[in-house]
Amino acid sequence: METVTVLRKKGKTYLIVSVNGFLTVTDCKSLNKLQKELLRQAYRKTKNEEEKALINVCLQSRLNR
């Protein structure tokens, strides 16, 4: 099961992603390999278009290439 939660605090946006029991919290500025893979899995599994868009923006960020 996957969940994607968006947390906005003090002008920053964070994604809290849980996939198959693995949990990661990211501000999308510096993803490690595990976080990237969890975001990709969540993207494939989620049916919510808003969540997909947020994950896509996070993965496409120039800082994460």
From Swiss-Prot:
Domain of life of the native organism: Viruses
Protein name per its UniProtKB record: Uncharacterized protein ORF65
Organism of origin: Acidianus filamentous virus 1 (isolate United States/Yellowstone) (AFV-1)
